[in-house]
Design a protein with these regions (language model features):
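Extracytoplasmic/periplasmic substrate-recognition and gating elements
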Residues: 13, 70, 186, 225-298
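Hinge/lid segment of periplasmic solute-binding proteins
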Residues: 23, 27-83, 127-128, 149, ...
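Extracytoplasmic/periplasmic solute-binding protein
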Residues: 67-77, 82, 109-165
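Glycine-centered hinge/linker elements that transmit conformational signals in sensory
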Residues: 112-119, 159-193
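Short, solvent-exposed loop/beta-turn-alpha elements that line the ligand-binding surface or hinge
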Residues: 45-58, 93, 100-106, 129, ...
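Conserved N-terminal structural module of periplasmic/extracytoplasmic solute-binding proteins
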Residues: 1-37, 50-53, 243, 267, ...
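C-terminal capping/gating helix-and-loop segments adjacent to ligand/active sites or protein-protein/ligand interfaces
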Residues: 250, 313-350
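Paired acidic/hydrophobic, glycine-rich loop segments that form the ligand-binding mouth/hinge
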Residues: 23-26, 206-211
Length: 350
């Protein structure tokens, strides 16, 4: 729990010494759910017309429907999804030697096979047996499990009105296992630093799936020792999905929560949020902070480029791929439930 969440919760509980509960604050679904159980959260659905709701990306609004009953308890302001980041410089000699291409990284099954080939290719560089290098990792393991299961038609945490039903199909879970844990155990996948971009920087990985908001952290060089390093260029690719399945994109990012107050206070918060998510305002805020706008009009690369913001080539690639994912892929995030999962954290395997 962050300091912000702890302070808001203390205010909601009326603890001695706590500040007054704010009218509006930034938070995730789990925190909104906890406050909603206390009767502190405003349903914003009645304050928006059908036309106003239609302006927002559907999946972003649905996250705020905590109980799946048509309410809106979290207002979207900026979001992110996941992409595949690749060290294109060190990929080049591997690709030339083995014939693999970026197309092989479109599916999880393809990533596993490429990782196997990379391990064997690097293993053959020395006379020491079984010293091949890992190819791939993920920042958020939970996203792989939940979105991967969703692609295969399984909702692991199926929530309705705050009540969760657990679905754990053996075949689906086995496929998730075979395409992550098995290659990890074999040394084809890896995780050692706090984030997978750290592992790329140290040369321990060549590729990883991470947040679209994390592109500024992709390293400019690989440091193979305290005295040796070389510059690298990134390649940004779509997040791999399972073969034969329609892609499901993770949606991430805090939203705005309005707490109960006077009618004037609530309406003021709603008007601010509507203004804040108007395309020109939302583009400036979201893109400058590394996130994606939340309306259809703003979540458009042409609109962003026309806004006058200076975009690097990498940022343009990230936006292009991310916006395509949120507009065309199914978006998924877990709905909150009692003692449910908190926002995805970096994956560090034991």
């Amino acid at each position: 729990m962050t300091d912000l969440e702890a302070n808001v919760l203390a205010a909601a509980q009326g603890k001695v010494g706590a500040a007054a509960l704010p009218n509006l604050y930034s938070g995730y679904a789990d925190m909104a759910y906890d406050l909603d159980l206390m009767g502190k959260v405003v349903d914003l659905a009645p304050y928006l017309t059908a036309k106003e709701k239609a302006a927002y990306v559907d999946g972003f609004l649905s996250e705020g429907d905590l109980m799946n009953n048509g309410e809106l308890k979290i207002f979207p302001v900026a979001k992110s999804t996941e992409l595949l980041y690749l060290n294109a410089t060190d990929w080049a000699p591997f690709a030339a030697a083995t014939g693999v291409t970026y197309d092989n990284l479109a599916t999880m099954e393809g990533v596993v096979e490429v990782a196997r080939q990379y391990y064997d290719w690097t293993d053959a560089m020395t006379s020491t047996p079984n010293d091949g290098k890992a190819f791939f990792g993920r920042d958020a393991l939970a996203n792989y499990l939940l979105c991967g299961a969703q692609e295969m038609g399984l909702t692991i945490f199926d929530t309705k009105n705050g009540v969760m039903t657990l679905h754990f199909d053996k075949d689906v879970i086995r496929k998730l296992w075979d395409n992550f844990y098995v290659p990890y155990i074999k040394g084809w996948f890896g995780a050692s630093g706090r984030f997978r971009s750290d592992d790329v920087k140290t040369g321990n990985l060549l590729a990883y799936v991470g947040s679209s908001a994390s592109s500024p952290f992709f390293p400019a060089q690989v440091m193979t020792s305290d005295a040796e390093s070389h510059a690298i260029e990134p390649a940004i690719l779509p997040c791999p999905s399972f073969a034969g399945c329609s892609p499901v994109a993770a949606q991430q990012g805090a939203g705005m929560i309005v707490t109960k107050g006077t009618d004037a206070q609530i309406r003021a918060c709603v008007e601010f949020l509507k203004w804040f998510t108007q395309p020109e305002n939302n583009i400036a805020f979201s893109v400058n902070s590394g996130y994606l706008p939340v309306t259809h009009a703003a979540a458009n690369l042409n609109a962003i480029q026309a806004s006058g913001l200076e975009l690097t080539d990498i940022v343009t690639q990230v936006l292009d791929l991310s916006l395509d994912a949120v507009e065309h892929d199914a978006l998924y995030t877990t709905h909150a439930f009692l003692e449910g999962p908190r926002p995805a954290s970096p994956c560090k395997m034991p």
